[in-house]
Amino acid sequence: LETLEIKNPLVCTDPGLSSIGMTDKIRDLISNEISPTFYEETPANPTEKAVNEALELYRANDCDGVVGFGGGSSMDLAKAVALMANHDGNLLDYAVNEGGYGKITETMPMIAIPTTSGTGSEVSVGSLIIMNDGRKLILASPHLMPNAAICDPELTEGLPPVLTAGAGMDALTHCICLLYTSPSPRDLST
């Protein structure tokens, strides 16, 4: 946080991590000079409503950066907040299918702290948001890549087994998908 000159981050996380005390670990790690604000209502699939709520909290507390703490949903929400905190208009203006790729410029500083190992959102340039009308919105830009990712395997300990298994299946699915959809096919026997 200090390297990115973030003094007042918005931490986007979900109710599940809050309920098992994981957000307390973040509070314990942050120095006294940093005043985090927590948005702990990230849904299982981040929504336009959640982005707007988190963005309102970001602005009301004069935040200067974003931390995505949790699974892919929390990190995708953090990316959308980092984008909208530094851009005019609404999310739809920046959707890939609406020509928004080129409109995305520098976002607010962002750190990703994954607690699962499934989506890879901490090292990707994309974010998936469910709009209020049910459409899936894809945001994509190199500017959405987190400035830093803190990958600590100890953060995956203590998660419910079903979540760990689901994240593992997600990672496996990403690998299989890459094999079959890559523009340069590979021999699957190697």
Predicted segments with their positions:
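N-terminal, positively charged, Ser/Thr/Ala/Gly-biased leader segments
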Residues: 1-9
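Single conserved hydrophobic/aromatic residue that forms the stacking wall/gate
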Residues: 180-190
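Short beta-strand/turn micro-motifs composed of small residues
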Residues: 13
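Residues at the starts of beta-strands that form the adenosine-phosphate
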Residues: 8, 35, 109
